[in-house]
Amino acid sequence: NLQQAMHGDRVTVRVDRVEGKAEGCIVRVLERANDELVGCYHVDEGGAGYVASLDPRVTTPVQVPSGTTGGAKPGQMVAVRIEDWPTPTSGLVGRITEVLGALEDPGVDTELIIRQYRLPYLHNPAAVAEAERLGAEITARDVVGRTDFCPLTTVTIDGDTARDFDDAITLETLPNGHHWLGVHIADVAHYVKEGGALDEAAYTRGTSVYFPERALHMFPAPLATGLCSLNPGVDRLVQSCLMEIDRRGAVVRYELHDGVIRSDARMTYTAVEAMLTLRDPETRRQHAALVPLFERMETVYRRLHARRVRRGSIDFDLQATQL
């Protein structure tokens, strides 16, 4: 009843009634879902090459004629493009387009995942060109009408292995004893115009994808690791929310700004814990200029936490798995 249809294909189905139950029979394949598969290359006893797909839903091996193996060796992981779809008298036929390497080789597992799930790993040339035209630094024109937060001590705080630094914080003490907390988010929208190549690329990708040893960023590098990365020592455009927090942890007023910041340091949760909780002398010496800032942050945290407890909030401390 499958009529050579494969997983994900769009098909026309005829529905029959068999003993009172509906039963379908595929009449025609309208659109093939996948014209490229990843799998392991093998050679059978007769010397014929084929690829066994890693997708358990694709049970038919892909025959690879001589001369289209791309130099693959038995046991290597490969990408294979389907040249001929199955018929009642023949199976899948394809040619190897890329040899990824042995499964145990470093990075091959990542390459397999990227191709198996068809993750876009190359940026559209138009999007790259649009990003490169933006330049490497912000200009005087970019900052017109923006609030300058550069004089404030500013830090990013992320995990040890973080690759994106797109949010930063500032914290000042007001004369009334309240705190003035600033949360600053990289202003991506300043650079990405609706309908442009970058906008279309971001819409297609939808998100960044992170692997242990690499990242597939939603935007090309000039934005992802450049203008929209809040690296220390460089001016960056941000969207800022400034909040006045009273002694009981309540936000009594707030302001929104188009801003400019200059991060003073890239901090990690590990370093902050060593500074505040463990009170490690070396960490406190290394970041001596920032210790007062983080002690203020700890004060605000305790006020916010106490307010959450009074409201009956539940905090789930879930362990994150790392490989």
Question: How should each PLM-predicted stretch be described?
Answer:
Residues I169-T173, H179, M243-I245, E255-D258, ...:
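Short beta-strand elements
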Residues L152, R236-S240, L318-A320:
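Active-site lining segments that contact anionic ligands and/or coordinate catalytic metals
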Residues H184-A186, E244:
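Short beta-strand segments
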Residues R302-L323:
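Core structural elements
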